[in-house]
Amino acid sequence: GGGTHHAHYSHGYGFCVFNDLAYTAINLIEENYAKSILILDLDVHQGDGTIDICQNYPSIYTCSIHSESNFPFEKKQGWMDVAIPAGSGDDFYLSQLQKTLENIKHRISPDIVLYDAGVDVFSEDGLGNLEVTREGIIKRDEIVLKHFNTRNIPVATVIGGGYSSDTEELASRHAIIFNV
């Protein structure tokens, strides 16, 4: 599970009670396990709570690629935010991911990446609107893991958002990250 990125410091929000990504990042910094951390959030929704909680930690970098027209409707300003138009599909989404990863590469070299591999970007997801196919999600996860692997930067993953009444299909989408 995990990826409860809407929970703020003082309150839960958007189906999230506490923010596991922010808590993990802060704990790693405060316990001196890492000097710099990237939280890469590819859920369809911006991780507003993560941004809010981590904003006072200059060595925690938040990067969110999300729908520009989906919850939360008032976006926070994180370290790097990429708002994608609804209905963008695989090609545009993956090109924005590639550009963002290159931008990150030229700006920071974190000790670890905490990756929210949300599958609510999927074209048939009940709460998403980016129209990314299953093949697009597979390619996305391959791109992310390869990018950081070639830089010798470890990646810890949470499955993030994904919504469907078909639980087998949803579980299959969430399993993608573990099969690439």
List where the protein language model places each region.
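A general "terminal functional-core" signal
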Residues: G1-V180
